[in-house]
Amino acid sequence: MNFEASRAKAIEKLNNFIEKNLSEYSKLRNFDFGPDNRTNISCLSPYVTHGIISEKEIIQKSLSKFSFSKNEKFIQEVLWRTYWKGWLELRPNVWSDYLIELNKIKEEFKNNQNYLCAVEGKTNIECFNTWVNELKENNYLHNHTRMWFASIWIFTLELPWQLGAEFFMQHLYDGDAASNTLGWRWVAGVQTQGKHYLASEWNIKKFTNNRFQNIKLNENAPPKVSEKSYQIVKQDFNNS
């Protein structure tokens, strides 16, 4: 995949997606056809992350072509980024605690074989290894694949979610502190207590068009547990 850092390219991608592919988005968005075929998704997130194009602009442009009812799923996905940013801004201790935990865990796992094999794409899970290499080479992963990846990392490879979140931020062109951190927390089961995401063999096969076989995962793992809860921190913008 090629991401050219220019506003002209961002607008071109947006227009092409709306004209050619948006009408089928809700039906095809969960499929990962591989890095050479991203026609079913917009691939605009790197441009949003770096401020080249805004969520508002994307939504307004899409609504100029299709009605809200035909656009609803796409708009929902765009607004998740905005929601996560607002959620984290109101609870900044989630981010500061994550950084503290990450520093401790990195030292503990620096020689851990499961971790070293995971980041090198040398596990016994073919699809996971493929995604590690794809992430490093393309600096992008399909959103559904990010969920599978995180679930395998946490529940099958039994690695801390904090290390996985860092690994994504090291490589993703669209790495966003809020979406990434809270997304990993959600998969683990600590963002919404007791609700986690477990990747399954049948789901991966279905939504990758059977590109991968013999996917042996822990599909019965319980959610991770966190004793911490975070209250909204009142924002004070009075500079007087």
Model-derived regions: residue spans:
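C-terminal catalytic domain of photolyase/cryptochrome flavoproteins
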Residues: M1-N143, S151-S240
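Short, solvent-exposed turn/loop segments enriched in Gly/Ser/Thr/Pro and often Arg
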Residues: M147
